[in-house]
C-alpha cells in the first residue's frame, strides 16, 4: 500500500510540473540513444535463463518465451523490430538481432502497457532522463515510411545528443497484429451515435490516431484530430472556435509539447471549457495514472483505443436524448 501511494505521489509531482521521465538505452555498443517513458517499464533485468523458441521463421519478431519472477512473457528484440517493414513482412530479420559478447547476459526491459507485459531485449540501459513536456519535439514522419513510423518524439541528452522516443504501442501492433484484427472485428459490432457535436482527439502516435479515426468514423461522429495536446489547446482556445459545438475531448496522456495532463488542467480550469467532458485514452493504464487523471477532473479513463470502450464513452457524453 505504501509503495502504491508513493507511486501516485511520484506521478502527481511529475505531471503537476508538466514533466516526464525517460529511460534511455542503446541497441548497440556506442550507438544512438533511444528512450521509453519510465511508467511503461516495470524493471530492467539481466537475463541468462532459458528461452523457449515458439517460431523458427526468419521474419519472426518474437524471440521466444522467457520466465521472469514466475511470469512467462514473450521476448522481443527491439533492434529486429527497427528493421521490420510492414510492407515487406517476409524480410529476414535474423541479421539484425542484438549481439552480445560471448558469456554476456541479455539485457531485458520488462514493459507493462495496454494491459500487456512483454520483455524487450536491448543492448544496454543508460540512465533516466527528466524532461519538461515542452522540451519534447514531435517525430511524426521520422523513423520509417508514413505507415512504418517507430518514433513518436525526440529530445536532447544531458550533453546535447539526440534521444529518440520509441512508439512502443506501434511495436505491440507489429508484433501481435491480431490485436488490431480483434479491434476491426469489434468495429463491425458498433452502431451509429446520433449527435451534432464534435469530438476533439489528441494522440502523438500515428498508428493510434488511425485506429481512433476508424472507430469514430464507424460511430458516425464528427471529429477533429491533433498530433499533440498543444495543437488541440490552440484550436480549442482560438477565438474562431465555437466551444458550444465541442461535446467531448479524448486525449492521450504522454504527448510532446503539451501532455494530456496539461490538456485536462487547462480545459477544466477555464470557465469557458470546464464543462466539456474529457476522456483519457491511454496505454499507461496503471492506477497511479488513472488516479492522477481523475484528480485533475478527467471524466473517464479507458484502455488505449478499445472500440467498445470508445463507443460507451461517446454514447454517454454525446448521444442526444
From Swiss-Prot:
Entry protein name: Chemotaxis protein CheV1
Name of the gene encoding the protein in the UniProt record: cheV1
Keyword Transcription listed: no
Keywords for this protein: Phosphoprotein
Function according to Swiss-Prot or TrEMBL: Plays an essential role in chemotaxis signal transduction system in order to colonize the host stomach. May act as a phosphate sink to control the flow of phosphate to CheAY.
InterPro entries: Chemotax_regulator_CheV, CheW-like_dom_sf, CheW-lke_dom, CheY-like_superfamily, Sig_transdc_resp-reg_receiver
A GO BP annotation: phosphorelay signal transduction system
Family matches, as SUPFAM superfamilies: CheW-like (SSF50341), CheY-like (SSF52172)
Response regulatory domain sequence ranges: 198-319
Record-listed 4-aspartylphosphate modification sites: 252
Gene source species: Helicobacter pylori (strain ATCC 700392 / 26695)
Domain CheW-like: 19-177
Phenotype of null mutants: Deletion shows a severe inhibitory effect on chemotaxis, although swarming is not completely abolished. Mutant also shows defects in mouse colonization.
Pfam families: CheW, Response_reg
Amino acid at each position: 500500500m505504501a509503495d502504491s501511494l508513493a507511486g501516485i505521489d511520484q506521478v502527481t509531482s511529475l505531471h503537476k510540473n508538466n514533466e516526464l521521465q525517460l529511460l534511455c538505452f542503446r541497441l548497440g555498443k556506442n550507438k544512438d540513444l533511444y528512450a521509453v517513458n519510465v511508467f511503461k517499464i516495470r524493471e530492467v533485468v539481466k537475463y541468462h535463463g532459458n528461452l523457449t523458441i515458439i517460431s523458427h521463421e526468419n521474419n519472426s519478431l518474437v524471440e521466444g518465451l522467457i520466465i521472469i519472477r514466475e511470469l512467462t512473457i514473450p521476448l522481443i528484440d527491439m533492434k529486429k523490430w527497427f528493421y521490420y517493414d510492414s510492407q515487406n513482412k517476409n524480410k529476414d530479420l535474423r541479421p539484425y538481432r542484438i549481439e552480445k559478447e560471448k558469456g554476456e547476459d541479455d539485457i531485458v526491459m520488462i514493459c507493462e502497457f495496454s494491459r500487456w507485459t512483454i520483455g524487450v531485449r536491448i543492448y544496454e540501459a543508460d540512465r533516466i532522463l527528466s524532461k519538461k513536456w515542452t522540451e519534447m519535439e514531435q517525430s511524426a514522419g521520422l523513423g520509417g515510411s508514413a505507415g512504418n513510423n517507430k518514433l513518436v518524439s525526440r529530445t536532447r541528452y544531458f550533453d546535447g545528443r539526440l534521444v529518440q522516443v520509441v512508439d512502443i504501442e506501434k511495436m505491440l501492433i507489429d508484433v501481435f497484429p491480431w490485436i488490431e484484427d480483434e479491434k476491426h472485428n469489434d468495429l463491425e459490432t458498433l452502431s451509429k451515435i446520433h449527435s451534432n457535436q464534435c469530438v476533439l482527439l489528441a494522440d502523438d502516435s500515428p498508428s493510434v490516431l488511425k485506429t481512433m479515426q476508424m472507430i469514430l468514423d464507424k460511430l458516425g461522429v464528427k471529429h477533429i484530430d491533433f498530433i499533440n495536446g498543444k495543437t488541440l489547446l490552440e484550436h480549442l482556445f482560438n477565438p474562431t472556435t465555437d466551444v458550444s459545438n465541442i461535446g467531448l475531448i479524448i486525449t492521450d496522456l504522454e504527448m510532446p509539447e503539451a501532455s494530456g495532463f496539461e490538456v485536462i488542467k487547462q480545459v477544466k480550469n477555464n470557465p469557458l471549457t470546464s464543462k466539456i467532458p474529457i476522456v483519457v485514452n491511454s496505454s499507461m493504464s496503471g492506477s497511479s495514472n488513472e488516479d492522477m487523471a481523475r484528480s485533475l477532473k478527467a471524466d473517464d479513463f479507458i484502455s488505449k483505443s478499445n472500440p467498445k470502450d470508445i463507443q460507451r464513452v461517446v454514447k454517454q457524453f454525446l448521444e442526444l436524448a
